[in-house]
From Swiss-Prot:
It is an enzyme of class 3 (hydrolase). The gene is apaH. Hydrolyzes diadenosine 5',5'''-P1,P4-tetraphosphate to yield ADP. Its EC number is 3.6.1.41. This is Bis(5'-nucleosyl)-tetraphosphatase, symmetrical. The keyword Lipid biosynthesis does not apply. Keywords: Hydrolase.
Length: 273
C-alpha cells in the first residue's frame, strides 16, 4: 500500500492519469490525496470530478477556492469566470450529483497514521491543530448541513483579515474559508494579504509566507498544501510540502509518494491559455 499526494489539478485530467500510470496506482490498495482545485482553467474539469468521485474511499480531497467557486456558480450566485472551462459540468447528466458530492468534501484532512495535515492553501499562523480542525468542521457543517446558500453568497470578502477567538458567525466562517482556500502571504502581525500572488522573491519585504511565521505547529507538524503555483522551486521548511507546481500554467503536475518522499512530475501536455 502506498500513499500519494498530488497538487492542484485545475482540470488537467490527462496529466493526472499519466502520473497515476507512472506510479502504477492501484485503488484497491493505494490512497490518493488531492490538495483541492480539481476544476477551473484546464479543459477536463468534468473528467477530474468524475474520476476522483469514482475512486470512493481510495481518494481524499480538500476543497480549494476554485471548487467553492464552482459551487457558487452552480447555485447561480456567481457567473462562470471567462478563464474557466467548466461548461461541460453544467450540462452533464450527473451535474447535481457532482456538485452535491463536492459540497460534502472537507477543508482540512489530518491523516494521523501518515502524520500529515492537508489543506488547500494552508493553516492560520494563529491556530494550533485543534483550532484548525474545529474551524474546518464549522465551515464543513454549514456547507453540508446548514444554510450553505447563505454561506456561499457571503464568503466573497477579504475581511476579517486577522484571527480572533471572539469571531462569531459569518465573520468566523469567512476567515476560516479564506485561510483554508485563499491565503498565501501574511503581514508580521499575522494579517492576511490577498493582493500578492507573486513568488517569495518578488514579493514586498513586509509580506511573509504563512508557513514562515512564528507558530509552534509549523515547526513540528507535516503540512501539505497547494494553491500557490508561483512557489514552484522555492525552498520550504522540511516539514512543509507545497505541491502546486502550475500544470495549468504550462509548468508541471507534481505527485508525492509519502512513504519514501519520492516526487513524480508530469509536464503540462498543452498550453491551457
Amino acid at each position: 500500500m502506498a500513499t500519494y499526494l498530488v497538487g492542484d489539478l485545475q482540470g488537467c485530467y490527462d496529466e493526472l492519469q499519466l502520473l497515476l500510470e507512472t506510479v502504477q496506482f492501484n485503488p484497491v490498495q493505494d490512497k490518493l490525496y488531492l490538495v483541492g482545485d480539481l476544476v477551473a482553467r484546464g479543459d477536463k474539469s468534468l473528467e477530474c470530478l468524475r474520476f476522483v468521485k469514482s475512486l470512493g474511499a481510495a481518494a481524499q480531497m480538500v476543497l480549494g477556492n476554485h471548487d467553492l467557486h464552482l459551487i457558487s456558480t452552480a447555485l447561480g450566485i456567481k457567473k462562470v469566470s471567462l478563464q474557466d472551462h467548466v461548461e461541460a459540468i453544467f450540462t452533464a447528466p450527473d451535474f447535481v450529483e457532482l456538485i452535491d458530492w463536492l459540497r460534502h468534501q472537507p477543508l482540512l484532512v489530518h491523516d494521523e497514521k501518515c502524520d500529515f495535515v492537508m489543506s488547500h492553501a494552508g493553516i492560520s499562523p494563529d491556530w494550533d491543530l485543534d483550532t484548525a480542525k474545529s474551524c474546518a468542521r464549522e465551515v464543513e457543517n454549514e456547507l453540508q448541513h446548514g444554510d450553505y446558500h447563505y454561506l456561499i453568497s457571503n464568503m466573497y470578502d477579504n475581511q476579517p483579515d486577522r484571527w480572533s477567538a471572539d469571531l462569531q458567525g459569518l465573520q468566523r466562517l469567512r476567515y476560516s474559508i479564506n485561510v483554508f482556500t485563499r491565503m498565501r502571504f501574511c503581514y508580521r502581525d499575522h494579517r492576511l494579504d490577498f493582493a500578492c500572488k507573486a513568488s517569495v522573491e518578488k514579493a514586498s519585504q513586509e509580506l511573509i509566507p504563512w508557513f514562515n511565521l512564528d507558530n509552534p505547529l509549523f515547526k513540528v507538524q507535516n503540512l501539505v498544501f497547494g494553491h500557490w503555483a508561483s512557489l514552484v522551486d522555492t525552498p520550504t521548511p522540511a516539514n512543509i510540502y507545497a505541491l502546486d507546481t502550475g500544470c495549468v500554467w504550462g509548468n508541471r503536475m507534481t505527485m508525492l509518494r509519502w512513504e519514501d518522499k519520492q516526487y513524480f512530475v508530469q509536464g503540462a501536455l498543452k498550453d491551457y491559455f
